[in-house]
């Protein structure tokens, strides 16, 4: 008796060649709907599923494979006499190979499918056959990925059957595949049919392997890079690398942080970042000048940094950047001449990202792993209106200081807490990240600012990601000659801080919104 294969695929890639090969190896093929039409067109002998079940396909194909003569053929254990006896009694012939891929739910979602279209792309019979076959992998070979066709054919050609170890690998892949498929459906329906003020009791997320990595944060750690099942266009995961060696774990983390900063700026802007903190941000009327400002902000720390530009890289900008060692440059595009200049540096990584999709949604989830669990929050992308800010001091900020505050407030959001930043209206001057007390961060930012020219420091302001708990911060700020501060406010000692600012003639604005970053 010939061995039987059941083939039912949405993705027809490679299926004709595969079917021809297994026919030549003596296999009988059972097929469904569209798959049968393709095989018939190529004159590959096959049997329609309804010839096996004696039951017609119906309900626009919703019901065709959910039948005991199919699932019994997949689930029956060949090593159990009771199973084989039941199969004989009910005229169930074994199926030894299942080749199934599922309705294109993800592809339809990404194409903007309507709710009705999405519902019709929820595959029922396909996952059921895959799961039945995978459960019985001791006897059944199950294939859900066209990339595995060649491996299956090789084993069948050489050995006449597949090895148990290979069937085990394929079965595990099937359950990963169906779990991912169901996770996307659950994610879609949860967003489509939300329950107000009720959190989902289960969190189902799915990610696809984008890149294996040589190591993680340190050489002794293993790491891989996975991309969200529903891709985010403006992301390091969707970037296109056009030059240089592969990204490392730390490269990906830093590039992600730099991209998050860049999307908050509309003007031509350059962001320089090291170890998850900005070391230079510059905005100007053109991208070359923006680079000058970002570089001038901290010409020491920028060495070996990550650079994001929100405009095309020009030849002049590329020539300037090529003079120092940089790990990564990310931009919407590169002029031909700029690419020629930068490509001469073998180790630099050049990437492009679609900046037209940079706007973030507050619904966009930010997932952070902790021991034994996950923390999930929405992105800190709330749109703020400076007109709603409150001047807390007697001294009013000048128009120039207000412009600098707007710039500082955008930038400090991305400094690790306790985060302090000193800026003028177009570039960062000093960054004080990640200290366990706020006055420590203030001192670091002011020290970095002190070596800048008087011209650059004119109209400089200081931004703080959270409130000042004590007035000692203001004492340090006043010593440095800073005359304007932007911070959220909200401390029980706000009045002490306000009084200190009034004492020193410093203007201070409360935004009412904190921006911790851990």
UniProtKB/Swiss-Prot annotation:
Signal peptide: none annotated. PANTHER family: BIFUNCTIONAL PURINE BIOSYNTHESIS PROTEIN ATIC, BIFUNCTIONAL PURINE BIOSYNTHESIS PROTEIN PURH. This is Bifunctional purine biosynthesis protein PurH. The keyword Hydrolase applies. Residues 1-144 form the MGS-like domain. Belongs to the PurH family. Pfam families: AICARFT_IMPCHas, MGS. PROSITE patterns: MGS. It comes from Lactococcus lactis subsp. lactis (strain IL1403). CDD domains: IMPCH. Keywords: Hydrolase, Multifunctional enzyme, Purine biosynthesis, Transferase. One of its GO terms (cellular component) is cytosol. NCBIfam families: PRK00881.1 (NF002049), purH (TIGR00355). GO terms for biological process: 'de novo' IMP biosynthetic process. InterPro entries: AICAR_Tfase_dup_dom_sf, Cytidine_deaminase-like, MGS-like_dom, MGS-like_dom_sf, PurH-like. Its EC number is 2.1.2.3, 3.5.4.10. It catalyses: (6R)-10-formyltetrahydrofolate + 5-amino-1-(5-phospho-beta-D-ribosyl)imidazole-4-carboxamide = 5-formamido-1-(5-phospho-D-ribosyl)imidazole-4-carboxamide + (6S)-5,6,7,8-tetrahydrofolate; IMP + H2O = 5-formamido-1-(5-phospho-D-ribosyl)imidazole-4-carboxamide. GO terms for molecular function: IMP cyclohydrolase activity; phosphoribosylaminoimidazolecarboxamide formyltransferase activity. The IMP cyclohydrolase activity resides in the N-terminal region. The keyword GTP-binding does not apply. Pathway: Purine metabolism; IMP biosynthesis via de novo pathway; 5-formamido-1-(5-phospho-D-ribosyl)imidazole-4-carboxamide from 5-amino-1-(5-phospho-D-ribosyl)imidazole-4-carboxamide (10-formyl THF route): step 1/1; Purine metabolism; IMP biosynthesis via de novo pathway; IMP from 5-formamido-1-(5-phospho-D-ribosyl)imidazole-4-carboxamide: step 1/1.
